[in-house]
Amino acid sequence: LLSDARAEAVESSVSELERLAISHDASHYLLVPAGLVRPDSAEDVANIFRAAGDLGLPLTFRSGGTSLSGQSSGDGLMVDTRRHFKKIEVLEDGKKVRVQPGATIMMVNNYLAPYGYKLGPDPASWSACTIGGVVANNSSGMSSGTKYNTYNTLDSMVLVLPSGTIIDTAEPDADQKLRSLEPELHEGLLRLRKRVLENPESMAKIRQQYSMKNTMGYGLNSLVDFETPVDILQHLLIGSEGTLGFVASATYRTLPILKNISTGLLVFDNLIDAARSVPELVANKLATVELMDATSIRVAQRTGQAAEALAAIDVKDHAALLVEFQGNSEQELSDLAAAAAPMFKSLPVASPVSMTSKLSERNALWAARRGLYTTVAGNRRSGTNALLEDVVVPVEVLGNTCSDLTKLFDSHGYQDSVIFGHAKDGNIHFMLNEQFRDPKQLDRYRDF
């Protein structure tokens, strides 16, 4: 296959050094690929798909490698898209943008900023994560929630199927082309949609599950939300972790940049009080509500660069919520703050609520949250693995969920665990540090 790739002028390598170098990503898995290719077009990928299919060789696509779950690792053929798939094309004066999978969120937003727009997805790893992974994981982030994730802001994509078929879903005849080139797939998607629509219980379950952040399995909501197979297919690829095909480019509908913003840190005596305050904050139109537990705060303080509001906390069992109002104008921002004032006074906070619109102060607060995972993971005991889980529950039961988690940590001896995340969406991360070379520690992890 690599000989064929070289004949087609596609970069390829079986060098042990290169294979070892690309085997490392942000996860704790280590799988060394058998070979490496760096295509520079959708047609190259189509040819690689066909050749790999003939040989029964599995493919893994790799862009930023920032996922903590190991999706960018594999021991078959590694298809590296970081070098040649970085094109960014601003469309309609910034209202849309066409992006290839090797471009980072930060790169795209830098292109869009002069037009006053940005992408919807805003993960904490925005400076390093790439569009390929953002599509493959249906990434959202701090304020995008489910409303502005890739699934809900995608306009079209150029996709490559394992058969080598290339479809540009923006073309008027895209669905006809799919039916002509992939009749079995086209018909199968229609049958699946019909099956779901004829089952009210399935419909209700899908609606309920996808009212929250949900990237478990394939995006079955596409069978409910879209009618044509080509629309269903392109939305099934979102969140499919690279298992259904390759996204050679994605065109997004963008969001206007709101310049009227105020940010604050709400400090609580304990995690449960903080978590149980979230529904009220959501009801009062806070654009972001980010949770940090006591361990998160301590780690942020130890960097020596924590914002004044964070550095001032005498941490015991405290927790904090980083919150933000966003408005189209100063008046809208003022109205949001005024409407929420009675709610702020009713919260069981440990210190007075203070909001700031100063960019330097806001950036200092956000720096602690955006760098939280790397800072916490970097402070773990030597020889341990940082294991991050990602769960979502209805916001109304977030407090009970955090309470149950802390009891689990205590009962299994995970005193150094951390809870943080996107509380506005009921989406929290918790981190365990474990030493897997010790059989007893492995048993503890299994029991947990």
PLM regions and their residue ranges:
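Signature for HUH/AEP ssDNA processing cores
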Residues: 379-406
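Short, hydrophobic/aliphatic alpha-helical segments
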Residues: 44-58, 112-129, 217-237, 364-367, ...
